[in-house]
Amino acid sequence: MSGLVPTAPEQPTEEMENQIKSPTAVPDAPPDYNSHFAPGPAGPVASPSAGLPMGYYIPQQPGAIPLYHPTGGTHPIQYQPGKYPVTNQPAPIMWMAGPAPVPNCPPGLEYLAQLDNIHVLQHVEPLELMTRFETNNRYDIKNNIDQMVYIVTEDTDDFTRNAYRNLRPFVLRVTDCLGREIMTMQRPFRCTCCCFCCPCARQELEVQCPPGVTIGFVAEHWNLCRASYSIQNEKKESMMRVRGPCATYGCGSDSVFEINSLDGVSNIGSIIRKWNGFLSTMVNADHFEIRFPLALDVKMKAMIFGSCFLIDFMYFERPPPRRMSR
């Protein structure tokens, strides 16, 4: 018995083959990892690597993006990365294309040389709606296709605005698409304590283009029944007349101010205050339409444009309503 070597019991051939075979083949070379995540179509689920039991957590490679699996069903992707919709952004302002230089035209008035119709839109001031505090007026000047031509802003201190309201002296600055001030309109203070037919109580507007160079005046004339103005040149020589309706504030209809020649025979243009329905009676957000001939001198167009603001302050710049006291 000392010459016999102990051996293991014989096993069936099938069991030995099963022990030799591995559940998965071990790759000869390490896999090629890529740090960039490239989503693709879903493929078959890979079995765990050799030597790891089923359900063992395999940490992700650095830089890999974990996948999100929604619960409760499959949800399609609504937005691509980087293309989320941005809300509450103001619409871009569409400006009128810059015209070519016009001979003998003040800088900045080249836009008016190409137009026969412009719209003056006053901004709604939320502070005036909630309180009785008067703020500086702002206007957008647009053409017929809703392109911005000018921006007009009032430059008056807080005390003057709230002390004198619609009778206040003011300075209006007109800027173009580049922010350059091309025109200035100013109204001096007129005492209203005197008789309304007294010359010292009549309103007047001076128009400067460019700022510092006077091109004309808009002067009020006494009239018992209707609004009456004269458009004058820089020497205060009357060039045109403006005649308003008998009732300047027409409820439910437009208010038309006609621009006529000095003899009153020919009609040159008009300034129309549009009726905006219920909004016109609640807030100071006026809409004016100015019409003049295309071939009219550009300085006279600027004077008609300036007379629109004097009319607005005198007849349509209403003080805010007073609160009822208990």
UniProtKB/Swiss-Prot annotation:
Bilayer topology term: Single-pass type II membrane protein; Lipid-anchor
Region feature (Disordered): 1-32
Motif mapping: SH3-binding 2: 41-49
Single GO cellular component term: nucleus
One Pfam family of this chain: Scramblase
Positions carrying Phosphotyrosine: 79, 84
Subcellular location: Cell membrane; Nucleus
Gene Ontology BP terms: calcium activated phosphatidylcholine scrambling; calcium activated phosphatidylserine scrambling; cellular response to lipopolysaccharide
Organism superkingdom: Eukaryota
Listed transmembrane segments: 300-316
Lipid-linked residues (S-palmitoyl cysteine): 193-195, 197-198
Protein name as it appears in the record: Phospholipid scramblase 4
Species for this entry: Mus musculus
Lineage: Eukaryota, Metazoa, Chordata, Craniata, Vertebrata
